[in-house]
Amino acid sequence: LRKIYKDDLEETIVSFINAETTKTRGSLIEVLKHGIELSNQKIELMYTKPATTFNPELTKKYSQNIFSVMEEVWASDKERIDVVIFLNGLAIMSFELKCNAAGQSYQDAIYQFRTDRNPKTRLFRFKAGTLVNFAMDLEEVYMTTKLDGQATFFLPFNMGNGHGVTAGAGNPAFKDKYSVSYMWEDIL
């Protein structure tokens, strides 16, 4: 590919990925799962976790996935996102974080997503942008897969609190960590 595209290879790949994710039947998930084909060359954009460790080559490829985290990402001149997580350079998750001690909650983050985030911004475009957007504070987490202004629907992404018939919404309180610590301990 370098021989064909020379110094424009990186820009060509990025443009091709963008075109594939934004076309009518395209999506970021499809591009991640199936890769892209450029000039009859297949380019894998992510490696899934192999079911077993029998094939060391697949295990090695999986370990080469690069997850990165960026704080304060500007999606446009007017939209700054608290945290964005990338997989091999492609934005897959966004987070609006609020602090209960400062008088804010996940509800403020939901309001921000509904009113301050343009669903047509490339980062938030349905199917082509982030796969999931999280609104969270130190006690609760909510998520949506599609930003749609005031019509954006958020689902709780909490562990639940209590056991059996006495279980309730939210997350358990812990003495030594935040109620939402499962997000970085178990999910991410």
Regions inferred by a protein language model and the residue ranges of each:
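ATP-dependent helicase/translocase motor core
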Residues: L1-L188
